[in-house]
């Protein structure tokens, strides 16, 4: 049997998806509140930067993978307009339900679907843009997921990955204290779940750093891959193109 990591813990590959699902079933109802608290609201700026770089136009088709509570999908739906198509997808039903309801509350009607990023249920060369924000690190086979994203994007289209990354070295010690002490404490106080936020910190440390993710995206056939460090590398936006 093959092993992978669930945070720092080694688990069988067949177990990881279920463990990750448990985390997000637990945190779904408090997800947005915790994002604001954990990042000091910075996650909104990171997403705004991603939206600007995406450059979605009227009529575009966009796939938002692991779209959670729908921040990106909401913006893309407004930009793509009635002639476009924006799909909000997530592998976690609890997160998808929260995202769907949140979009409806904002008056945004867009299709939603349960979707495993390693087996995307769309044809080749279908979307102008595929995005995944804060989801790739939770996937068991990141290379397979990225290959699927490349498959469904059109020639000339983009795959964009917004994800926690390798922080600037002088900040590492302070960031570790925050990640492994403050985050679980916040998770317990606000969401009643310290363990899920301990996993969050661990999963960030196990995720490929900026240059490693560039190589991984290139290995699946994406080209002209570049990245933008945000907030001293706490987060990075990677952009790959298909030709």
UniProtKB/Swiss-Prot annotation:
Alphabetical list of Pfam families matching this protein: Ubie_methyltran
Keywords: Menaquinone biosynthesis, Methyltransferase, S-adenosyl-L-methionine, Transferase, Ubiquinone biosynthesis
CDD domains tied to this protein: AdoMet_MTases (cd02440)
Listed EC numbers: 2.1.1.163, 2.1.1.201
Pathways involved: Quinol/quinone metabolism; menaquinone biosynthesis; menaquinol from 1,4-dihydroxy-2-naphthoate: step 2/2; Cofactor biosynthesis; ubiquinone biosynthesis
Keyword set includes Transport: no
Entry annotated with the keyword Methyltransferase: yes
PROSITE patterns reported for this sequence: SAM_MT_UBIE, UBIE_1, UBIE_2
Annotated catalysed reactions: a 2-demethylmenaquinol + S-adenosyl-L-methionine = a menaquinol + S-adenosyl-L-homocysteine + H(+); a 2-methoxy-6-(all-trans-polyprenyl)benzene-1,4-diol + S-adenosyl-L-methionine = a 5-methoxy-2-methyl-3-(all-trans-polyprenyl)benzene-1,4-diol + S-adenosyl-L-homocysteine + H(+)
GO terms of molecular function: 2-methoxy-6-polyprenyl-1,4-benzoquinol methyltransferase activity; demethylmenaquinone methyltransferase activity
Enzyme class: transferase
Annotated residues for binding of S-adenosyl-L-methionine: 69, 90, 116-117
Lineage: superkingdom: Bacteria
GO BP annotations listed: aerobic respiration; menaquinone biosynthetic process; methylation
NCBIfam families found in the cross-reference section: MenG_MenH_UbiE (TIGR01934), PRK00216.1-1 (NF001240)
Sequence similarity: Belongs to the class I-like SAM-binding methyltransferase superfamily. MenG/UbiE family.
Function: Methyltransferase required for the conversion of demethylmenaquinol (DMKH2) to menaquinol (MKH2) and the conversion of 2-polyprenyl-6-methoxy-1,4-benzoquinol (DDMQH2) to 2-polyprenyl-3-methyl-6-methoxy-1,4-benzoquinol (DMQH2).
PANTHER family: 2-METHOXY-6-POLYPRENYL-1,4-BENZOQUINOL METHYLASE, MITOCHONDRIAL, METHYLTRANSFERASE
Name of the protein this chain belongs to: Ubiquinone/menaquinone biosynthesis C-methyltransferase UbiE
């Amino acid at each position: 049997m093959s092993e992978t990591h669930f945070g720092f813990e080694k688990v069988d590959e067949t177990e990881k998806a279920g463990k990750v699902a448990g985390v997000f079933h637990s945190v779904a109802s408090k997800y947005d509140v915790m994002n604001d608290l954990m990042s000091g609201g910075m996650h909104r700026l990171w997403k705004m930067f991603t939206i600007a770089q995406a450059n979605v136009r009227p009529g575009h088709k966009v796939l938002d993978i692991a779209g959670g509570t729908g921040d990106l999908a909401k913006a893309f739906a407004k930009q793509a307009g009635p002639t476009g198509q924006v799909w909000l997808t997530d592998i976690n039903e609890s997160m998808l339900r929260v995202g769907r309801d949140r979009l409806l509350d904002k008056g945004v009607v867009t299709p939603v679907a349960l979707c495993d990023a390693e087996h995307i249920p769309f044809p080749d060369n279908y979307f102008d843009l595929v995005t995944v924000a804060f989801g790739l690190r939770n996937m068991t086979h990141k290379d397979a997921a990225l290959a699927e994203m490349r498959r469904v994007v059109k020639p000339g289209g983009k795959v964009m990955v917004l994800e926690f990354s390798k922080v600037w070295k002088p900040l590492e010690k302070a960031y570790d204290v925050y990640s492994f002490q403050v985050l679980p404490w916040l998770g317990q106080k606000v969401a009643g779940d310290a363990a899920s936020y301990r996993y969050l910190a661990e999963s960030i440390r196990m995720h490929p750093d900026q240059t490693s993710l560039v190589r991984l995206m290139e290995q699946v056939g994406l080209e002209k891959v570049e990245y933008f460090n945000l907030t001293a590398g706490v987060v990075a936006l990677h952009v790959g193109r298909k030709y």
